[in-house]
A protein has these predicted regions:
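A short, N-terminal "cap"/entry segment at the start of jelly-roll beta-barrel domains
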Residues: 2-5, 12-13, 19-60, 109, ...
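A short beta-loop-beta micro-motif enriched in histidine and acidic residues
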Residues: 53-58, 69-84
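Extracytoplasmic
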Residues: 56-61, 77, 87, 113, ...
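Soluble periplasmic/extracytoplasmic beta-strand elements of cell-envelope proteins
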Residues: 65, 91, 129-132
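Short acidic-glycine-tyrosine-enriched beta hairpin
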Residues: 66, 96-113
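Histidine-centered metal-chelating micro-motifs
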Residues: 71-73, 108, 112-119
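Glycine- and acidic-residue-biased ligand/ion/polar-headgroup-sensing regions
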Residues: 77-96, 106
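Ligand-binding loop in jelly-roll beta-barrel domains
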Residues: 113-138
């Protein structure tokens, strides 16, 4: 074997040996990762199909915090939105009287173009992460609908 070939083989073995720890480190973190599906939906929680707006996609993520006894007030979202409750207890009401109760760790596909009100009905402040799937310069994320409040007799 030529001296050049022996030197090349030695260098290759040394490089492979040096990179071996990095290869095992790349595998280890994936073995320590746990994936839990929070939501998989084709419809909002009130049964309406989810449709994305046209145009350049723009995703917005918000942390929404509601104090004890607080509420969002009546509003609607013209774009699809998806939330995960981190803390507190959330009650979402529709004008037709339907309600959805969320506890920490639960997720939902919010209603689209439907007036609703979210209230913190728990005993601790509420924290909710919501992602909105909108389009650049198209619709707002939320539109107030104070006239949608259900009438009480």
């Amino acid at each position: 074997m030529s001296r050049h070939l022996l030197s090349l083989r030695s260098v290759s073995i040394c490089v492979a040996a040096a990179l071996l720890p990095f290869a095992t480190q790349a595998i280890e973190p994936s073995q320590a990762v746990k994936v839990t599906q929070l939501l998989k939906a084709t419809q909002t929680w009130n049964g309406v199909p989810i449709k994305y707006p046209e145009g350049q996609a723009e995703v917005t993520g918000l942390m929404i915090e509601i104090a004890l006894g607080g509420e969002t007030h009546w509003h609607e979202h013209p774009v699809p939105s998806f939330g995960v409750l981190l803390e507190g207890t959330l009650e979402v009401s529709l004008t037709d009287g339907r309600k959805k109760l969320l506890k920490p760790g639960e997720a939902l596909a919010e209603v689209i173009a439907t007036a609703h009100n979210g209230r913190n009905v728990g005993t601790t402040p509420l924290k909710l992460i919501v992602f909105y799937a909108g389009a650049v310069d198209k619709q707002p994320l939320s539109v107030p609908r104070p006239e949608s409040k259900p009438k009480t007799n």
